[in-house]
């Protein structure tokens, strides 16, 4: 039962967390709350979707085949899909260009223009309901001071990042919530190096002097390193601040943020439904995706 009307309820029900699961099958192999039980193995899993799981070889492939009991099986155009877990972006791109894969959702930035010219009918570039952002650990100096946090944000030339590093036609973000549908958020913080230097000086760090060593946490992907190095250069050029980059594999990266053992960290969020709330409620005090130590009572009252 809803506490109040929610216009985006139909959008939420499309999320995978709302998909029905077979209770009887789960209980045959353990308790409902147990993780990694045998009910998800190909020989045990019960599903009601377009495809059924036939093979799952860890770090090798996931194989699905058309579900003969699917209600609309006549309109399913392919017999199956083989998913390949490829960790190296360039390896995946090479496999696609060599004809070893039919579909890839990623392209190395330096290969985007090549792909557009060589395979114009195969490349699709569509807007995504997502935002890249940087987390600041507000429990650790110097980011306890909002002037420092804003200064670091104002020192980022977003358009330069898009043009010279990302190269995928992204749009500069004016805030955490991206534009979509008829929703057009106001720009809260943009590129303003002079304003950034002024704020940093007001906080007691003119030209970056007196700042403790700042570590920028990111993942171990090749593109993550390039993004981090671009930010590192901007903060040096626009604030006079030296940043140390620390790359970690995904699990360690997430754990380190949960433990708030970082200064700055690369982040991003893909909206789960078409409403600003999907980008805002993660910043509640006890939100599992907050990971910054930040909270604001007035903000939470407005959300509720």
Question: Which residues make up each language-model segment?
Answer:
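Short helices/loops that flank or line small-molecule/ion binding pockets
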Residues: 90-100, 117-118, 146-147, 229-238, ...
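Gly/Pro-rich hinge or "lid" segments in bacterial periplasmic/extracellular proteins
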Residues: 3-6, 13-76, 80, 90, ...
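Append "and occasionally in soluble cytosolic enzymes with long acidic Gly/Pro-rich linkers
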Residues: 52, 65-66, 124, 144-233, ...
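Short, solvent-exposed loop/turn segments at the edges of secondary structure
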Residues: 46, 57-59, 76-78, 118, ...
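Ligand-binding "clamshell"
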Residues: 113-125, 260-262, 275-290
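Extracellular/periplasmic solute-recognition and catalytic clefts
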Residues: 54-65, 82-140, 150, 159, ...
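Extracytoplasmic/peripheral linker and loop segments enriched in polar/acidic and small residues
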Residues: 184, 223, 237, 241-258, ...
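Beta->alpha turn/N-cap motifs
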Residues: 4-5, 89, 105-111, 158, ...
């Amino acid at each position: 039962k809803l506490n109040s009307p929610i216009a985006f309820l139909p959008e939420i029900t499309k999320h995978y967390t709302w998909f029905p699961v077979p209770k009887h099958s789960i209980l045959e192999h353990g308790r409902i709350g147990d993780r990694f039980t045998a009910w998800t193995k190909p020989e045990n899993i019960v599903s009601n979707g377009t495809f059924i799981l036939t093979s799952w070889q860890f770090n090798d492939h996931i194989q699905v085949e058309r579900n003969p009991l699917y209600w609309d099986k006549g309109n399913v155009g392919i017999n199956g899909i083989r998913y390949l877990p490829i960790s190296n972006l360039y390896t995946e791109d090479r496999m696609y260009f060599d004809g070893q894969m039919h579909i890839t959702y990623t392209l190395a930035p330096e290969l985007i223009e090549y792909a557009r010219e060589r395979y114009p009918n195969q490349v699709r570039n569509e807007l995504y309901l997502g935002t890249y952002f940087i987390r600041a650990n507000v429990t650790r100096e110097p980011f306890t001071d909002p002037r420092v946090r804003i200064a670091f944000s104002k020192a980022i030339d977003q358009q330069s990042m898009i043009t010279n590093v990302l190269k995928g036609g992204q749009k500069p973000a004016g805030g955490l919530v991206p534009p979509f549908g008829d929703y057009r958020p106001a720009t809260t913080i943009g590129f303003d190096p002079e304003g950034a230097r002024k704020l940093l000086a007001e906080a007691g760090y003119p030209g970056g002097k007196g700042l403790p060593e700042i570590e920028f946490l990111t993942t171990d992907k090749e593109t993550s390193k390039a993004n981090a190095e671009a930010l590192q250069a901007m903060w040096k050029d626009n604030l006079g601040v030296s940043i140390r980059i620390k790359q970690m594999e995904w699990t360690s990266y997430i754990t380190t943020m949960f433990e708030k053992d970082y200064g700055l960290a690369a982040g991003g969020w893909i909206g789960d439904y078409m409403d600003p709330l999907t980008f805002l409620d993660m910043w509640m005090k006890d939100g599992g995706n907050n990971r910054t130590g930040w909270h604001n009572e007035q903000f939470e009252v407005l959300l509720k």
